[in-house]
Amino acid sequence: MESQNKASLPVMDGLERRVVASQSEGASTCDLLLRVLALVLTLAAAIVLGVDKQTKVVPIKIVDTLPAINLPVSAKWHYLSAFTYSVASNAIACSYAALSLVLAVSGKKGIMSIVIVLDLLMVAMLFSSNGAALAIGLMGYQGNSHVRWTKVCHVFGRFCNQVAVSISLSLLGSILFLLLVGITSLRLHKKSK
């Protein structure tokens, strides 16, 4: 009876190794897919906001007794530092996603702890830039009567819509980086057991 149990152990051990190997390959495929999606989303967010500009002819009244003068006014992404920060942080996150994708494909074992820290830095950077861009976007959409900032999105509708799309894409990209942090942390935790 004991000889039968000992004989079946190597077979079970080999089967368990194959199951564990296939689970780690699945996690690796998931990791690669999330990195590719994060790369695409942050690249799209940087491009959508980076090409965002709109010019409108706006009537400007200088003196109440004179008629308004129609002047062309432009809204461009680089006029506001929050949007510049958003484009730069999405470009950095996109570049990092490409680099981490290459590192993940290469299969180096000792870099997982570095990758998780860098993923977490990307999450923090993207969330901070999204918050800054969203705050300025809301100022453009709603204005602020306390400091006499008027809303501008009723004039520059396409510009504001592109800002909203860029922020949404960037938020999705940052959520993917957050998922990568969680998945990598769980994988490292399982390996340490």
Swiss-Prot record:
The keyword Transmembrane applies. The keyword Hydrolase does not apply. Pfam families: CASP_dom (PF04535). It is a multi-pass membrane protein. It is found in: Cell membrane. Keywords: Cell membrane, Membrane, Transmembrane, Transmembrane helix. InterPro entries: CASP/CASPL (IPR006459), CASP_dom (IPR006702), CASPL (IPR044173). Residues 52-86, 135-162 are extracellular. Residues 1-30, 108-113, 184-193 are cytoplasmic. One of its GO terms (cellular component) is plasma membrane. The chain crosses the membrane at residues 31-51, 87-107, 114-134, 163-183. Homodimer and heterodimers. Belongs to the Casparian strip membrane proteins (CASP) family. This is CASP-like protein 1E1. It comes from Populus trichocarpa.
